Amino acid sequence: KVDYQQGLSNSAVLCLFQDNVGLMWFGTYDGVNCWDGKTMEVFRSDFSESKTLSNNVIHSISQADNSCLWISTHLGVNRFSQKARQVVANYDFSGDYYVHSNNQGNTWILTGDGIYYYNTHHQRFIRVQTSVLPVDSMERRAFVTDDGGLWVFPPSTGQILNYSLNRFDTDSLSVKLSISTNKFHSKAIEDIFYQNGIFCFVDCDRDLYMYDIS
């Protein structure tokens, strides 16, 4: 059990994540908490610092690469160094947005005004398409594969949209986007979960399926 007695900054936990070295991260209404099994470390907005959390309301936490995390707040995305224990970059996103990434750091963001990817050469997010997708519930309708592809399952359909880039780490003028749309399932897909090359999905009949993308 982990609560205020262990140093949790707020009892309303909005998200949790286990990083690549086994530490547990909790996003709350009052900052980010890191739990190593014995002690709690709390990170909040501190505007006396040059880089800080955009906001203390934490919506999601995910792996950015082998040394950083993505922390999504109410006012934007923060790149957080696990080694330095501090925010190293801020990216403004307003409204509803959803961050999806894999362990290699290939990162996409779905928003109401478009789809973005993180260009590691420029170290910023670049929009690659004006969105025609409803962003509602996209936190559970998309994932990034091990090779960096973005798989999106639009609501009320059995379709899949595949987005892929030739490179994440080159000048944006040299980046080529490929998009394909395919029928994936005979019934509407409601929820998905992806891990280690396999994803599970539940359709509108509440039947559960497992799919090996390899």
Regions found by a protein language model. Give the residues of each.
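Carboxylate-rich, polar loop motifs that coordinate divalent cations or form catalytic acidic clusters
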Residues: 1-214
